[in-house]
Amino acid sequence: TVDPIREAAAICAAHDAIIEINAHCRQPELREIGCGETLLADSDRLTKYVEAAAAEGAVVSVKVRAEVPGVDLPALAREMEVAGADVIHVDAMDSEAVIRDVAAASDLFVIANNEVRDRASVQKYLGYGADAVSVGRPSREPTGAVMRRVAAAVEEWEAPIQ
């Protein structure tokens, strides 16, 4: 049912917040109830969720993962854009170049995720056409150190050329 999506989206819209629909997580307990990664194989249901959230006036993000057999992320990005999504948040796994394909396929705001740790990873993703990057779990390093490096790299990327 889309009712919980509508309710959450209405709250997000009222608070100028983003609702992110999880078509990403692969934990068995989420997949068993039809959430997370299972939505990638059920684009009709995912589309209904996006349409319901967008109808409430919320900014809608869809988090997806690369390397799921049978899933064409650029085509899915186009579908999500038509359904009313504003953002696609891509866990690029071991296929960073998928960011380029997704960015070229739609006008969605693209957030790249996976192994964002430093200047090189930020520049790689932004170079592929991502509009932003997100940091998941900083492996063994303290979160603050990773975040400072990523923030500096983004600032450097966005600095005006003199």
Label the predicted regions:
Residues 1-74, 96:
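Active-site entrance/lid segments in N-terminal catalytic domains of soluble metabolic enzymes
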Residues 3-15, 68-80, 104-112, 116-135:
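Catalytic cores of alpha/beta
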Residues 15-28, 85-95, 128-150:
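Glycine-rich phosphate-binding active-site loops on the catalytic face of alpha/beta enzymes
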Residues 31-34, 101-105, 137-162:
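C-terminal helical cap(s) of enzyme catalytic domains, especially alpha/beta-barrels
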Residues 36-38, 79, 152:
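Residue-level signature of transmembrane alpha-helix interfaces in integral membrane proteins
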Residues 45-56, 71-84, 93-107, 116-119:
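Short loop-to-alpha-helix "cap/lid" segments that border enzyme active sites
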Residues 48-52, 111-122, 139-144, 158-162:
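Short, basic, helix/turn surface patches
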